[in-house]
Amino acid sequence: MKPQARATEDLDDLVHVMDHGAVCDTERRGHHRPQGRSPLDLVVDASEGFVPLWEKDTTLRWRFRDRSFESFADPDAAKAAVRTLFGEALLAWGDAAPVRFVQDNDVWDFEIVIRQSDECSIKGCVLASAFFPDGGRHKLTIYPKMFEQVGQERLETLIHEIGHIFGLRHFFALLSEEDWPAQVFGEHREVSIMNYGANSQLTDQDKADLRKLYEMAWSGELTHINGTPIRLVRPYHVVGIPTRFAIPTLGTVRMA
């Protein structure tokens, strides 16, 4: 086993510490400031060699993974509480949200899953994890530790994870990691929901930049970000089912 100090140092390269040992588990942490860019910019995913954004008029269909709620004394009440929290997080993004969400137990794009036990390291415990835009099936995973947060912190955790679903990255994911590349669009002040600690708060600037990013991508005005092509993607329920059934379209946080 590595000495604890060495193990902690190595983990610094792998996890995104938000505050008080809270670490987002959706992506790894970046290191450098390519081309002298400030870390206070809107960062979007480019881990596949392109920037994936959702196609216009996309609706993501989700469902609960029922068996993951069976450990609750009242599974239906637990689902209702999570549904309310998820709805509040979506409402926080307001009309800047580039996609709609609808619950669908039959044909779904992602599941909301409650883990039965925490996932911890010397850096902290996972609160939640999400996914980036693509045509696969995914999970929005919530860990028990998230329910130990106070109300606003819990809400901000889900707002942050929904930011990943929209395609946003952490500030430290700024470009030049070959395995986890990102691209920069627009500018942010220090306070941002995709930033760290006390600065991890949803701002009007967050929403304005996200809205502008998608409007320009959908109109064709923006086709590349810093030389990396934008690719508009469709969800699983459109691309992952036989064509005759497809509906035509127009186009982790850890805590100590």
Short names for language-model regions:
Residues 1-81, 90-91, 181-185, 212-256:
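Disordered inhibitory propeptide/activation segment of secreted metzincin zinc metalloprotease zymogens
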Residues 43-46, 80-187:
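Metzincin-family zinc-dependent endopeptidase catalytic domain
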Residues 61, 111, 193:
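Short hydrophobic-acidic sequence motifs that mark active-site Asp/Glu residues
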Residues 67-69, 117-119, 169-172, 199-201, ...:
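Acidic glycine-/aspartate-rich tracts in secreted/extracellular proteins
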Residues 69-81, 141-149, 195-200:
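Second-shell loop/turn segments in exported
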Residues 171, 184-213:
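Post-HExxH zinc-binding segment in Zn-dependent metallohydrolases
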